[in-house]
Amino acid sequence: MEFLQLTMQNSAVTTNSFRAWYLAMRPKTLVSAIVPVALGAAYAFSQTSIEQFQKLPILLCFAFAIIMQIDANFINDYFDCLKGNDKPEERLGPKRACSEGWITLAAMRRAIVICTIIAAITGLPLIVYGGYKLIFAGLACILFCFLYTTKLSYWGLGDLLVILFFGLTPVCLTYYVAVPPALQTFPLEVILLALACGLVIDTLLIVNNYRDRDNDRKSGKITLIVRVGERWGARLYLLAGIIGELLLFYVVYTQNESKIGSMLLILYLLAHFYAYEKMIQLRQGRELNKILNLTARNIFIFGTLSVFALLL
């Protein structure tokens, strides 16, 4: 799979073609949108009967999350190109569509508008299940997409926002709309599950910023990794995964005391430790893109094992 994707990126890409849009969507990042919704849905299912479990809002949550992730990728691609942050000769990460000329800026602007509108239309029916207050949550998600690339990531707030918008918001709100009205609260277990999810997904941002730390420092992008340095940056990666896993272990064990479910979760830690060891060996440069791929895989492992453990 990695070879095929590299081949696709290195071969000629026709401007505004299907292949160009496929690459701009960054399919590997979609796991970060799917996992939080899956965790919120799994916990809701474990707390209700099949009859009480609300299935349609779960589908809407999945659709909203995926569309917003694609929208965020388009926005990031567009504004980084405008700012000159994705110069092909300097970029360490995967190639970006606008900077490479695969997609014109005008076409990307239209795509951003269309994605934002579709996401809003998709999320609007959720107010039937969770009330009008969900409108504010949806608007916050849309606002986050724009502010993260344009402002907030330059102030070192990226990690906090990932925990909020890839952990607390999607996990808690998915649970909220999936259960019957009598259960529409935010119990401690849901909040801890959401924090666990946010921390694990943040490992993807941490390794991305760890790779780009020198370029970010030069461009004035003061990420958390730029602030703490290489050594503590690697430790943050390790700790985020460990703390996230411990929180999940607590939720799973207190919910059903399933020893099998709890043991399953160890598999994620093994994968996380392996990625960390490779990360500190490679240290810098484009080789760290391998750790980015490993981390995306680990998030998928975390999500899959978590769902199984919650449902056992």
What are these regions (language model features)?
Residues 38, 50-78, 135-146, 185-207:
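Membrane-embedded alpha-helical segments that form the functional core of polytopic membrane enzymes
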Residues 162-213, 231-235:
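Functional transmembrane core segments of multi-pass inner-membrane proteins
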